[in-house]
Curated annotation (Swiss-Prot):
Family: Belongs to the inositol monophosphatase superfamily.
Organism: Arabidopsis thaliana
Protein's recorded name: Bifunctional phosphatase IMPL2, chloroplastic
Annotated knockout phenotype: Embryo lethality.
Catalytic activity reported: a myo-inositol phosphate + H2O = myo-inositol + phosphate; L-histidinol phosphate + H2O = L-histidinol + phosphate; beta-L-galactose 1-phosphate + H2O = L-galactose + phosphate
Locations listed in the record: Plastid, Chloroplast
Length: 346
């Protein structure tokens, strides 16, 4: 995955799918996902031609040593009505992305390697464009940062920024394994206030909003407690993605847990939020790989930070520099602290 837009050796025609209009201006619009009893529709349009420069950005972080209190997490400037509206748009984005992804899953299509040799497909590109079109039509003052095309905003910064990863786990998508997902985050003044993990093949959608309990297909969920590392189930996508130094740190945790597991991409975090695993530890993630996970994990009662225990914020600007980050997510603050102590990352 890349932190900024790149040119591909092959071009695709990007035409978002046609669908009914999203009633985004109506505050009473329900926030249920398409996988519960009510389906959200979304605005359709052809791909919008917006000049995209190679923008870069950075992350800053704030320390956190306590389990998040979901009753006090919403920014005071943001009303419940606004948050509900943004959640409705987020669900519409996931619907649009999922419609594209299901069209191409386990089908034959061209695969292009990016500059870092990570793969991209027409499904990645079309899914991102479908989401971008909805945001531009419903929330034109918001900025967008997508994995495939980077920063999209006429301004150099914005209070609201949507961070999109149309297919987190493209290799799993290519090989027909449904553990990939669409990641959608909304940041307000640098803080993730809304996050969605959508698995369009299994039709599972996790949505987290600061100040509210995380839901899976409309039902409240929560993480589980684990008293010590020796009883923990741990996920990471692949140990081959770690640098030598990071792999040594990871191995100190791996050697203490009950069961180390591999290969789930963003789905591992969804399983953690639902109370099926205890830890997820990964290295070298870009902002679009994990910002959507923050409200989902925290709203389910878990903790997610970098390897030093600092919480994630994104201070967006057109001239910021992108870097990679190490992420540890846990079902509760106790097992999270034990993982940090074992990582010994300074």
């Amino acid at each position: 995955m890349l932190a900024q837009s790149h040119f591909f050796s092959k071009s695709f025609d990007l035409i978002p799918p046609q669908s009914p209009a999203l009633r985004s201006a109506n505050p009473s619009l329900r926030i249920s996902s398409s996988y519960s009893n009510s389906r959200l529709s979304f605005l359709s349009s052809s791909a919008i031609a917006v000049p995209v420069s190679r923008r870069r950005f950075c992350l800053t972080m704030a320390s956190n040593s306590k389990r998040p209190n979901i009753s006090n997490e919403s920014p005071s400037e943001l009303s419940d009505t606004e948050l509900d509206r943004f959640a409705a748009v987020g669900n519409a984005l996931a619907d649009a992305s999922g419609e594209v992804i299901r069209k191409y899953f386990r089908k034959k299509f061209d695969i292009v390697d990016k500059d870092d040799m990570s793969p991209v497909t027409i499904a990645d590109q079309m899914a991102e464009e479908a989401m971008v079109s909805i945001i531009f039509q419903n929330l034109p003052s918001h900025a967008i940062y997508g994995e495939e095309k980077g920063w999209r905003c006429k301004e150099e910064s914005a209070d609201y920024v949507w961070v999109l990863d149309p297919i987190d786990g493209t290799k799993s998508f290519i090989t027909g394994k449904p553990v990939f997902g669409t990641l959608i985050a909304l940041l307000y003044k640098g803080k993730p206030i809304l996050g969605l993990i959508d698995q369009p093949i299994l039709k599972e959608r996790w949505i987290g909003m600061n100040g509210r309990r995380t839901k899976l297909n409309g039902e409240d969920i929560s993480t589980r407690s684990c008293p010590k590392l020796s009883q923990a189930y741990l996920y990471t996508t692949s140990p081959h993605l770690f640098s030598e130094e990071a792999e040594k740190a990871y191995s100190r945790v791996r050697d203490k847990v009950k069961v180390p597991l591999y290969g789930c991409d963003c789905y591992a975090y969804a399983l953690l939020a639902s109370g099926f695993v205890d830890l997820v530890i990964e290295s070298g993630l870009k902002p679009y790989d994990f910002l959507a996970l923050v409200p989902v994990i925290e709203g389910a009662g878990g903790t997610i930070t970098d390897w030093t225990g600092k919480r994630f914020l994104w201070e967006a600007s057109s001239s910021a520099v992108a870097t990679s980050f190490n992420v540890v997510a846990a079902g509760d603050s106790d097992i999270h602290q034990q993982a940090l102590e074992s990582l010994e990352w300074h």
